[in-house]
């Protein structure tokens, strides 16, 4: 079943895939990485002016990685804001997704965390570097195929 945003995008010839609705009734769409930046700009102009959150997860060991964006359309005088969830999947061998930092500035630290934990490179992000782990850390700790090191010394903890 397609939601109103999916129908709106389809009428304009914008490639996407409807993933249905979540348990709260929020429409979920899948966008290809190569189409994500242009569709993000269109969604912003359409009124999705607030990026509530961005996160990422490992779909399966050896499988795809996903970057998830929760967008909200905030309008004056509207009590129930319209929301949409966008999922962008990428291959773990070369995980690259266009950054939407220049569309929604609030994605700055969130994309950096996704990079730090899962190794997804967000193209054109101005400060893409580790945010939680030390720069010397090897690997991506939230990937399902990650092998934790036996010992890691935290230096200068106190």
From Swiss-Prot:
<keyword id="KW-1278">Translocase</keyword>
<dbReference type="GO" id="GO:0019684">
    <property type="term" value="P:photosynthesis, light reaction"/>
</dbReference>
<comment type="similarity">
    <text>Belongs to the complex I 30 kDa subunit family.</text>
</comment>
<dbReference type="InterPro" id="IPR010218">
    <property type="entry name" value="NADH_DH_suC"/>
</dbReference>
<keyword id="KW-0618">Plastoquinone</keyword>
<dbReference type="Pfam" id="PF00329">
    <property type="entry name" value="Complex1_30kDa"/>
</dbReference>
<keyword id="KW-0521">NADP</keyword>
<dbReference type="GO" id="GO:0009535">
    <property type="term" value="C:chloroplast thylakoid membrane"/>
</dbReference>
<comment type="function">
    <text>NDH shuttles electrons from NAD(P)H:plastoquinone, via FMN and iron-sulfur (Fe-S) centers, to quinones in the photosynthetic chain and possibly in a chloroplast respiratory chain. The immediate electron acceptor for the enzyme in this species is believed to be plastoquinone. Couples the redox reaction to proton translocation, and thus conserves the redox energy in a proton gradient.</text>
</comment>
<dbReference type="GO" id="GO:0048038">
    <property type="term" value="F:quinone binding"/>
</dbReference>
<dbReference type="InterPro" id="IPR020396">
    <property type="entry name" value="NADH_UbQ_OxRdtase_CS"/>
</dbReference>
<keyword id="KW-0150">Chloroplast</keyword>
<protein>
    <recommendedName>
        <fullName>NAD(P)H-quinone oxidoreductase subunit J, chloroplastic</fullName>
        <ecNumber>7.1.1.-</ecNumber>
    </recommendedName>
</protein>
<keyword id="KW-0472">Membrane</keyword>
<dbReference type="InterPro" id="IPR037232">
    <property type="entry name" value="NADH_quin_OxRdtase_su_C/D-like"/>
</dbReference>
<dbReference type="GO" id="GO:0008137">
    <property type="term" value="F:NADH dehydrogenase (ubiquinone) activity"/>
</dbReference>
<keyword id="KW-0934">Plastid</keyword>
<keyword id="KW-0813">Transport</keyword>
<comment type="subunit">
    <text>NDH is composed of at least 16 different subunits, 5 of which are encoded in the nucleus.</text>
</comment>
<keyword id="KW-0874">Quinone</keyword>
<keyword id="KW-0793">Thylakoid</keyword>
<keyword id="KW-0520">NAD</keyword>
<dbReference type="InterPro" id="IPR001268">
    <property type="entry name" value="NADH_UbQ_OxRdtase_30kDa_su"/>
</dbReference>
């Amino acid at each position: 079943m397609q939601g109103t945003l999916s129908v709106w995008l389809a009428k304009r010839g914008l490639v996407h895939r409807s993933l249905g609705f979540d348990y709260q009734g929020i429409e979920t769409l899948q966008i290809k990485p190569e189409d994500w930046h242009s569709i993000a700009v269109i969604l912003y102009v359409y009124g999705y002016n607030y990026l509530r959150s961005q996160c990422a997860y490992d779909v399966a060991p050896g499988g795809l990685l996903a970057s998830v964006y929760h967008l909200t359309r905030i309008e004056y005088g509207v009590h129930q804001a319209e929301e949409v969830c966008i999922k962008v999947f990428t291959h773990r061998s070369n995980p690259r997704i266009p950054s939407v930092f220049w569309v929604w500035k609030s994605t700055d630290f969130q994309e950096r965390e996704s990079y730090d934990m899962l190794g997804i490179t967000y193209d054109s992000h101005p400060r893409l570097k580790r945010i939680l782990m030390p720069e010397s850390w090897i690997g991506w700790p939230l990937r399902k195929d990650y092998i934790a090191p036996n010992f890691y010394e935290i230096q200068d903890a106190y």
